[in-house]
UniProtKB/Swiss-Prot annotation:
Job description of the protein: Capsid protein (CA) is the structural component of the virus-like particle (VLP), forming the shell that encapsulates the retrotransposons dimeric RNA genome. The particles are assembled from trimer-clustered units and there are holes in the capsid shells that allow for the diffusion of macromolecules. CA also has nucleocapsid-like chaperone activity, promoting primer tRNA(i)-Met annealing to the multipartite primer-binding site (PBS), dimerization of Ty1 RNA and initiation of reverse transcription.
Residues with Phosphoserine modification: 416
Top-level taxon of the source organism: Eukaryota
GO molecular function: RNA binding
Positions of region (Disordered): 1-93, 126-173, 352-440
Lineage: Eukaryota, Fungi, Dikarya, Ascomycota, Saccharomycotina
GO biological process, one term: viral translational frameshifting
Biased composition regions of type Polar residues, renumbered to the chain: 1-23, 48-60, 127-152, 419-428
Protein name: Transposon Ty1-OL Gag polyprotein
Conditions for induction: Ty1-OL is a weakly expressed element. Induced under amino acid starvation conditions by GCN4.
Subcellular locations according to the entry: Cytoplasm
Organism in which the protein naturally occurs: Saccharomyces cerevisiae (strain ATCC 204508 / S288c)
Presence of keyword RNA-binding: yes
């Protein structure tokens, strides 16, 4: 029938006829790969029957002999997605565990290739600056690992040391520059404290409160490599890791020492800017204090030249040392040593003047003895005329008696009286008073 139709229409090309026949065969003979798994048996029976009837269809008869097509899957179903990220960004278990480690559910125990960020743990994109773990890889830090019993020898200690953290612990940001490492390590230490690992952080003396366990060391090693890529580490950190790439504790200890050094630098600058000196302390002690501060700042990279140092020192001088501001302010090339020579000269002059002054202070016992001897030996017996005396009336009576007797005596007695005017007149009374001439 079909050959008759083709002979009736010779203008139709042979290619079009072949295309129509091919399309008809596709519709009549369906490929068993497109059939669901529930109809596999029927497809096999149909293909067997077709093979017995038509020997010219080898494609359909060869399908059931292939063991790989025993349980075909629908071609239209997409592959399942494992986690919140696309399938092409995920890694297989063998790729995630190149060292042969067992696959842990706890994110802290996932082994990482040193200083390499896998797309599985840190997918590209601006959605977050922190690493995010897919649900199929790890659980929150508060959830114990389902395989922890097969991995850790002491699961109770591991739960208390590592998994007894907050449910959501914010990780530190990614290190992006060597200059940001001092600030980054502060956030990393805070992250360890929030993860109940504050006891393993070195203290001021460089020693931790307790001994770190192997599991905690693994957690330290893994998290440090994730959040601090090697290309952004300072040189001194790389030097430590080149000796021992797991010595994260030494890096933390050195970082804490540098933090203390930075605090000391700030204190030295404040002390140098607020210097005060008036000679109350020895000049040697003041010079030692200032030179130690300047040398310490210079060793730490903060250079203080002579001009700035002299200005800061002279700014704090007071008292007799204050005039050094005006005698030396024009000397542009003056050094700190020359300035302290002038300070020493003034201090020695002050000490010499204090030692040369006589000491007029007398002992208290000597003063008491002098006061006693004065009151006992220097009591006056000759008393000058005092109009407030109580016995003034008796003195007047005695004077009147003497005057009357002198008038009644002969003239020879007048000469004796005139001669004795320079001698004190003695009165014979019970008070034993002596009157000087001219006082009455």
């Amino acid at each position: 029938m079909e050959s008759q139709q083709l002979s009736n229409y010779p203008q139709i090309s042979h290619g079009s006829a072949c295309a129509s026949v091919t399309s008809k065969e596709v519709h009549t003979n369906q490929d068993p790969l497109d059939v669901s798994a529930s109809k596999t048996e029927e497809c096999e029976k149909a293909s067997t029957k077709a093979n017995s009837q038509q020997t010219t269809t080898p494609a359909s008869s060869a399908v059931p002999e292939n063991p790989h097509h025993a349980s075909p899957q629908p071609a239209s179903v997409p592959p399942p997605q494992n986690g919140p990220y696309p399938q092409q960004c995920m890694m297989t278990q063998n790729q995630a565990n190149p060292s042969g480690w067992s696959f842990y559910g706890h994110p802290s125990m996932i082994p990482y290739t040193p200083y390499q960020m896998s797309p599985m743990y840190f997918p590209p994109g601006p959605q977050s600056q922190f690493p995010q773990y897919p649900s199929s890889v790890g659980t929150p830090l508060s959830t114990p690992s389902p395989e922890s019993g097969n991995t850790f020898t002491d699961s109770s200690s591991a739960d208390s040391d590592m998994t007894s953290t907050k449910k959501y612990v914010r990780p530190p940001p990614m290190l992006t520059s060597p200059n940001d490492f001092p600030n980054w390590v502060k956030t990393y230490i805070k992250f360890l404290q929030n993860s109940n690992l504050g006891g393993i952080i070195p203290t001021v003396n460089g020693k931790p409160v307790r001994q770190i366990t192997d599991d905690e060391l693994t957690f330290l090693y893994n998290t440090f490599q994730i959040f601090a890529p090697s290309q952004f580490l300072p040189t001194w950190v790389k030097d430590i890791l080149s000796v021992d790439y797991t010595d994260i504790m030494k890096i933390l200890s050195k970082s804490i020492e540098k933090m203390q050094s930075d605090t000391q630098e700030a204190n030295d600058i404040v002390t140098l800017a607020n210097l005060q000196y008036n000679g109350s302390t020895p000049a040697d002690a003041f010079e030692t204090k200032v030179t130690n501060i300047i040398n310490r700042l210079n060793n730490n990279g903060i250079h203080i030249n002579n001009k700035v140092a002299c200005q800061l020192i002279m700014r704090g001088l007071s008292g007799e040392y204050k005039f050094l501001r005006y005698t030396r302010h024009r000397h542009l090339n003056m050094t700190v040593a020359e300035l302290f020579l002038d300070i020493h000269a003034i201090y020695e002059e002050q000490q010499g003047s204090r030692n040369s002054k006589p000491n007029y202070r007398r002992n208290l016992s000597d003063e008491k003895n002098d006061s006693r001897s004065y009151t006992n030996t220097t009591k006056p017996k000759v008393i000058a005329r005092n109009p407030q005396k109580t016995n003034n009336s008796k003195s007047k009576t005695a004077r009147a008696h003497n005057v009357s007797t002198s008038n009644n005596s002969p003239s020879t007695d007048n000469d004796s009286i005139s001669k004795s005017t320079t001698e004190p007149i003695q009165l014979n009374n019970k008070h034993d008073l002596h009157l000087r001439p001219g006082t009455y």
